[in-house]
Each structure stands twice: as structure tokens, then as C-alpha cells.
Amino acid sequence: MAVMTYREALNMALREEMRRDGRVFVIGEEVGLYEGAYKVTQGLLKEFGPRRVVDTPICESGFTGVGIGAAMVGLRPVVEMMTFNFAIIALDQIVNTAAKLHYMSGGQFNVPIVIRGPGGPAAQLAAQHSQSMETYFYHVPGLKVVRPTTPMDAKGLLKSSIRDDNPVIFIESETLYPVKGEVPEDPDFVIPLGKAVVRREGKDVTVIAYMGMMYRAMEVAEDLAKEGLSVELVDPRTLRPMDTETIIGSVRKTHRLVVVEAGAGFAGMGSEIASFVTEQAFDDLDAPVERVTGANAPMPYARNLEKLKTPSKDKIAAAVRRVCGANGG
Amino acid sequence: MAKTVAQQKAIPGPGLDPQLARRLLGTMLLIRRFEEKAAEAYTLGKIGGFLHLYIGEEAVAAGATSALRPDDYAISAYREHGHCLAKGADPRRMMAELFGRRDGLSKGKGGSMHLFDRSVNFLGGHAIVGAHLPLAAGVGLAIKYDGRDQVVVCYFGDGAVAQGEFHESLNLAALWKLPVIYLCENNRYAMGTSTERALAQTEIWKFGQTYGIASERVDGMDVDGDLEVRPDVRDRVRAGGRHGRSCRARRRRPGGRPGARRSDAVAHRGGHLPVPRPLDARPRGSGLPDQGGSRAREAA
């Protein structure tokens, strides 16, 4: 184990996979000479050269399509979106082509592509650069969607994503890039896609969160422990396919569930989780499932308004207390 | 299996080798007959969804494929039956696909607009206008990445030219010197909208020039006068160039939707099969049985 930042963990994953497999290459805006808008690809051009670290002009649809075409005939591209908000420009390529080629060609062609970059609320980046983009992708059959919370997950899940034979949407976070954590240096270390993790054991209530919301929920759990509430924290890590088994298992244990997500709540992750928990574990629930979500508005710029838009510790704590108080607790 | 003309050594211009001329005619006739049968089955309700026929444009696919090697790639939009047949796909498996059968090329999951055949390097079958052009650049990038000497032919219609991805793809292919041949089948109508109503520059080949891609306009109805992809073009692209071609072609059938009406302008365009000159002079020295030539004329 080594202690490193989330950014360094991603860089290590890219480097190891590029060393392991000559078909893996990186393509996107500023990934080479500039070494990445957020320095995730730092040093890759120097080690692997311009053949495998391809700088593109600003044309998300074009270079995503290039990645898909290259993947159809045997390469394994890692496409960087400078921020995932820009992936909307390539949404047609991702949804209509990458996600569907394997199916609509009757299995003749597959698209082993990873599309990665930061997304979600950051630091006053305002309406067009702060969206929780996962919702746009996890609805689509044929796509896998990953949101890695810790440096260790960032490395292990990115490596699995690159090794996957089908398209993976891998959304990081600007605010997590400098976060430090323990990361295995073993080049064979991977975390399988579709596996949730219990980050904190508890018995009174299950809280599901990922990315920045998980760090916030962790603080809430520590605070509430002082009040005698025992919170179990589950991080899905992969949103599609979702590890429903781990989530249901936790709900059967605690009988209460709160889902926290940074994005707007309507038809969000929390809606889906509440739905399958109700379908599969209705009799285990002692209280209605609660969702703590971002406000139903674009992200404002002003710092105080930005804070109002995203789920706060207070809101999370209040939801946890409500579900624990329901039905006599 | 369909006969492919892919392995023939083509000689550009009017001095077309009679053997090649015969194969070109065979490919064109195969496409014409396939499409006529598909139209019949569509009318009978045995083929569903959209059916975009290639009738009237056969010379482009036949001519272009004649200059390719079997291991070269072809990628197309949704009026792709002819490109897929010319590349050498099994017409029975293609028709099975149109019928939605499990023995179809894509196991019945793709249909008319999503024909793929990995065994002949036919990469589809893409039904969002313009979206497959960046894919072609990606295939070109992979060829260059691996240091191979294949080329990819990218067929598209005049309707794709107004899309941003046309320009993004040409820019990237030119910038990175990718072995892509862009072949525009300009039948002058994107569904019901004429190029005059859609493009500020209707000389489509000039867009290629803008990106520094050697480009030219050819007559897509003159299969032997100017083969759609001449061997010298292919070899130049193989050696690291790019190439753009805009073919004038005539689509005889209207668009692919049930109940699609042909506008007057569309209805009045022709749909004859261009018979290669050496064969058109039949029976004087073409070596072709009478039947072949006469059937071709019948199709005119």
C-alpha cells in the first residue's frame, strides 16, 4: 500500500494498463502535451509517445466517435472528457453507437471503450460545469456506469473498466482529485465492476451515498453515533450494473434506508434504489425510504447558493433522524 | 455466396477489362435484384420498419469495392444494402436479417439499417445521419496505430454534409493523415430536401479540399468511365493519404418510410443500371452471353 491522491491513483491505473496492453491508448483534449486539464494523464505522453496519447481538437462527438471506431477494430481507447458536462455533445455517439453496436450487430462487434472525466458539483463552477451526469447514462442498456469515491476505488475500478469488453462511463470528481488515501501498488489489483462496498457497519439505518456525498455522510454518521444512532454506509461504486444484493442485504439488517445524491432528485439514483428496495424488501422496511437530493434547479454560481443547492450535512442528518424516529424507532 | 469484385485488378477509364466489366455488371445486377425482392417483401409486409433501397446507385458500390482488397474496411449509413452486398456478404443472410430472422447477419436484431458482416470487414449499418463518419476516422486511426496498410471506405449521403460530424471527421482524418476514403453518394436529396435547400456549397467535393483532402467529383452513374475508387486512389490512401469523392447518383426509390411519397423532383430522376461500356457494345467481342446484356438493358 502507498498513500497517494485520487488523481495519482487514476494516473497509476492508466500507466499500468498501458504497460500491460499495447492496444490501450488515451485520447482527448489536452491529454498529451498539456498533461491533462486536471493532470490525470501527467507523464503519459513522455512514457508512451503521441501514438498512444492522442491530443485532439475540441470536438467531443468527433473524438468519441474516433474512439468507438478504433474499438470496433481491436483497440481499447480511454477517452477523456475534460469535464463530463461536455459528454452531452457526444451523447449520440455514446448512446446510439457505443452502447448499441454489440447488440445490433448480433454480437459481431463490441466496443471496449472507457469514457472518463470529472463530473458533479465542484467549487463554484456554475450551471454548465457542475452536473451529476451519471443520470444521463445509467438509463441506457449497454452502458456500465462507475463513480469511484476513494483513491483505491479510482485505481481498481478504472483498471477493471479498461479491461471490460464493453463501454464503461467512468465519472470522477474535480473536488476528489486531491483527496489522499491508501492504494495498492500491485499492478494486478483490480476491483470488479458491479460490486458495492459497506464503508461503515451499523445497525439502525442504511445510508447509500457515493463520491463527495459519501464523505459528507461519513461525517454525519460519526456525529450521529454520539447520539446513539448506528449508521451503516453503503457505496454502490458501480451504478450500472448495481449491486442490489449488497444493498438489499443491508436494508434487511437495518430496516431503514436513506439515499443521498448530489444531482436533482426527479428520476434520479435514489428513485431507482427506492424502487427496487420496495419491490424486493418491502416487508423488511420499518419506515419509508428517504431521499436527500440536490435541489430541483441548475447549479448557481454564488458560494452560499451553491451550498443551498447540494445536500448538506444537516439535511442528511435530519433525514436519518426522521427514518429512525418513524414507527417508534 | 455472392460473387465479390474485390479481388479484381481494375483499370481506370474506358479501357475496362472485360472480365472486370462482367463482374461489375454482376454485382450491380445482384444489388438490383436483391433490392427489387426486398421491395416486394416490404409491400407484402414481410419486412418491417424502414427500408432504404439502393436502386439507382448500384454503380457506386460496385465500382468502389472493385478497387478494394478483401481486408479493407467499408462503413456506411442506413442505405447500405448495396455496400454490404458489394463487399461480399451472403445475400441470403442479408435477406434473412431484413426478415428479422435469427439466421440473419445480425441475428434479426439489426434489420435493414444495421447490417454488419465481420467476415468481410463490413462495419455497418448506422442510422444516425453523419454519426458513422467519426467512426471511419477511428478505423483509420486503428489501421495507422497498428502499422497496417488497409484503407477504410466511408459511404455517406449528401444529407450528412450539413452535420457537424462530417466536418469533425474530415478535419481529424486530414490532421492525422488517416487512410480514409470519404465517398459521398450525392443523390441531391436528403429525404425531401434538395442540396440547394440544405447546403450553402452544393459542390460537396470542395469541402474535402478545404480540409486538405484530395477531392474530386465523379459521375456515379458511369461505372467504367470513372470507377468510384480507382486503384491509384486506393494506393495513395494506403500510403498515408486521404481521399474525398462526391458521386452524383440517382436514387429511384423514395425514402424508407411506409407511405413515403416521392416528390415530383424525386420521381423524375432516373434509375437505369449503367452497363459497363465493354459490355454495352455486346455482342461484338465482349465475350458475354447475350442474356447478361439484355437483362441489364431490361433493368434500365
Language-model-derived ranges and their functions:
Chain A
Residues 1-167, 171, 175, 307, ...:
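Thiamine diphosphate
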